[in-house]
Amino acid sequence: MTSTLNTLKSNLGSRKKKLRKGRGIAAGQGASCGFGMRGQKSRSGRPTRPGFEGGQMPLYRRVPKLKHFEIINQKNYSIVNLSKLSEFKDNEIVNIDSLVKKKLLFKPKFPLKILGNGVVKVKLKVQAHAFTKVAQEKIESAGGSCEVLNNK
């Protein structure tokens, strides 16, 4: 059997009629249209917005905002750039105590970390708890040494 445009039919159940609410009891959706009896949810202009609690102060406004929280296990360092280490002489040891004596570090309460901003022209023995890769490369290329201290 050949099919032509005038004999085409849609599949059964593929073209379902729209349910007409409020058009008589026999339809099954008459009178209250499936919204139940009285109340805000049965009125026109529904639904209420998400999070609405009937005029009561909603939960998302009762709970305080998430702010001023501390990062768990955050590693804080007292930082010194290589540009400040130019005040030291050749073959001098650089550690927290020597930095405090030269007033390059004030009241250090965190472990020492050396950052790579600046140039080192002298040979230094640097003792710190952490180094950036660039800082370590610059110190060693100048003929110095980097000693990583135990981080307690």
Swiss-Prot record:
Residues 1-56 are annotated as: Disordered. One of its GO terms (molecular function) is rRNA binding. GO terms for biological process: translation. One of its GO terms (cellular component) is cytosolic large ribosomal subunit. Keywords: Ribonucleoprotein, Ribosomal protein, RNA-binding, rRNA-binding. Residues 25-37 have a biased composition (Gly residues). Pfam families: Ribosomal_L27A. Residues 14-23 have a biased composition (Basic residues). Part of the 50S ribosomal subunit. Belongs to the universal ribosomal protein uL15 family. Binds to the 23S rRNA. This is Large ribosomal subunit protein uL15. It comes from Prochlorococcus marinus (strain MIT 9515). The gene is rplO.
